[in-house]
Amino acid sequence: HKTDSFVGLM
């Protein structure tokens, strides 16, 4: 999901 991708680059 969108948030998933965001957490991936975290």
UniProtKB/Swiss-Prot annotation:
**Methionine amide: residues carrying this PTM:** M10
Q: Name one GO cellular component term.
A: extracellular region
Its subcellular locations are: Secreted
- Principal cellular location given in the protein's record: secreted
| Function (record text) | Tachykinins are active peptides which excite neurons, evoke behavioral responses, are potent vasodilators and secretagogues, and contract (directly or indirectly) many smooth muscles.
* Keyword annotations: Amidation, Neuropeptide, Secreted
Cross-referenced InterPro entries, in alphabetical order? Tachy_Neuro_lke_CS (IPR013055)
**Membership in a protein family:** Belongs to the tachykinin family.
Species this chain originates from: Gallus gallus (Chicken)
Q: Does the keyword Iron apply?
A: no
Name the record gives this protein: Neurokinin-A
Q: Which residues form the signal peptide?
A: none
> Does the record's keyword annotation contain Secreted?
yes
Q: Name one GO biological process term.
A: neuropeptide signaling pathway
